[in-house]
Amino acid sequence: MAPLQTTYALTQGRFIVGMIPDMRTPGQDRSLNVEPAAGIGFGKSVGQGTAERQIKAIATGQATAFLGVTVLDTTQLQDSYPQYATARVRTKGPVVVTVSGAVTPGAAAYVVPATGAFSATASGNTLVGKFETAAADGGMAVLNLT
């Protein structure tokens, strides 16, 4: 039988997408139901779904207002919330997200309505908070939702 893992990192990664990064005063979270059949990953921007208390990921072709960010749930069997699951959605406070373009601490954070990506670029995007850590394009940063 071949080994499953043959190399090990010296340390664990700093962040996991969707994680709550620290123990400061709690943020504000809502429990909402996942609408899409494909489910919704952790650390994703979400908006209002078709029905009350439903959410869907903000993505190309969806004209939905930003509600919050899905929070990591280690009880899920995959790296996402499946359809009909109750998702924890952060509406205020810190959460780790993947960024589009480089970001710096203190920079205003925006969600891109066409893609749902988080960016420091203001043009045509929706202000959602501030970045608390730096990250390169495609990296993970702490976003403090306001």
Can you describe what each PLM-predicted range is?
Residues M1-T146:
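Surface-exposed, low-hydrophobicity beta-strand/loop segments enriched in small/polar/acidic residues
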